[in-house]
């Protein structure tokens, strides 16, 4: 086992603080509307230019092992805030740096670290409760657009696009961000349920100009098996032909004789049919078939539950207002399933999301909710260069997370004002002893740091602005973009409550751990081993010389 380097007490804390400061100083220059950019070098390709706190934090590794530990712990704050609310990473880093710096000063002055931590925790818990009372619900498009604009670094187009997307697909709908092809940002909305499976035979196409199959008010047959024998399907086909409606077959596969017969029937105009493979694989396919059944009011015909295809009737088939199938996708619009059944299914999938362990599973389940709940919107980001595209895409994703957080828990005044108001409301909070009171003061002082940093990045004097904002009340604050004072909510400067809350909680959590650190252990760097090979060679040469 390699030898370890161990540092105790103040030596350890000084090193750790140095690492914290390197990372936080790199991240905090990006805060606010006048935050600066950070350029990140990549081992290949063009450098990335970003104003996203967590992207900067992830790039930082320090050479000194002890300093690096400090930096990594603050990186954890940024990552956690990003995972919880998708934004607020820079605010969380600034808060953590302030709590750690002030907390370690108090420890150096002889305070008890555990009581300091208790004081900090007490202040943060009280602050979170106060934030909830300040929070205003965010439901109208205007407020959603404002949140998106602020989070995308004051880019109004992005804010409006996100508000429009949420308007189209609902608050629960899936909104994805992709690379666009032009210079302008675009919004593409797919209504209804769409899945990635196209028609099984081009002979089903009935709209040659678009190369698509369009079925009006079709019956939908859902089968969790391969269909290769046409006899199994005859009763259903006859019933559908009598009803005079088209039929969409969604099955594990339709092949051989069955597919050929369906194609011939369609071409002769006897019955209008189209067949597609069921989406997904394995258990996910079963679940998605069940989703489609719920949406269309049908039943999945599965041998697992003792149902046979030849015994199925029109009652087992789902229905929709319209179905559009092209080479790669199938879209079911306006299924006739009961609203209560669809809501029940959505609640069930939500429960699975809560229990999901992997991000991949969570994402897939989220997609299923969206397909059932409303639709999918795609924001296509336009940019002139690849570097700009990367930067802009990251901003749009941040803005999207922020607006979701705003819809979930409401909004508070932005620009660091909410934390200042919260701090003044809990200023009288007292702990059980003097050391806890110092911990509370450390947390209260930290709550001013985001506002001070925003002002500093504007090139103004932080103390002057902080005192002016403190002397006001309610949503009165400083608009860093226009450099004027006023009502932040009226000026459209909003922060999602969830983002501010997560930033404060994660910053205090990690800072509390660092203040109570008394010892740090790391591997000793391996010393340079003497290069024996080279020395041996030289000796040989000398010997040769002597012989000659």
Swiss-Prot record:
Pfam families listed in its UniProt record: Cpn60_TCP1 (PF00118)
List of residues binding ATP: 30-33, 51, 87-91, 415, 479-481, 495
PROSITE patterns per UniProt: CHAPERONINS_CPN60
A GO CC term assigned to this protein in UniProt: cytoplasm
InterPro entries on file: Chaperonin_Cpn60_CS, Cpn60/GroEL, Cpn60/GroEL/TCP-1, GroEL-like_apical_dom_sf, GROEL-like_equatorial_sf, TCP-1-like_intermed_sf
Enzyme type, top EC level: isomerase
Keywords: ATP-binding, Chaperone, Cytoplasm, Isomerase, Nucleotide-binding
MF-aspect GO terms: ATP binding; ATP-dependent protein folding chaperone; isomerase activity; unfolded protein binding
Domain of life the protein comes from: Bacteria
EC number: 5.6.1.7
Cellular localisation: Cytoplasm
Record's keyword annotation contains Chaperone: yes
BP term (GO), one: protein refolding
Gene3D superfamilies, alphabetized: GroEL, GroEL-like equatorial domain, TCP-1-like chaperonin intermediate domain
Similarity-based family: Belongs to the chaperonin (HSP60) family.
Subunit field text: Forms a cylinder of 14 subunits composed of two heptameric rings stacked back-to-back. Interacts with the co-chaperonin GroES.
Alphabetized PANTHER family for the sequence: 60 KDA HEAT SHOCK PROTEIN, MITOCHONDRIAL (PTHR45633)
Function: Together with its co-chaperonin GroES, plays an essential role in assisting protein folding. The GroEL-GroES system forms a nano-cage that allows encapsulation of the non-native substrate proteins and provides a physical environment optimized to promote and accelerate protein folding.
Protein name: Chaperonin GroEL
Gene name of the record: groEL
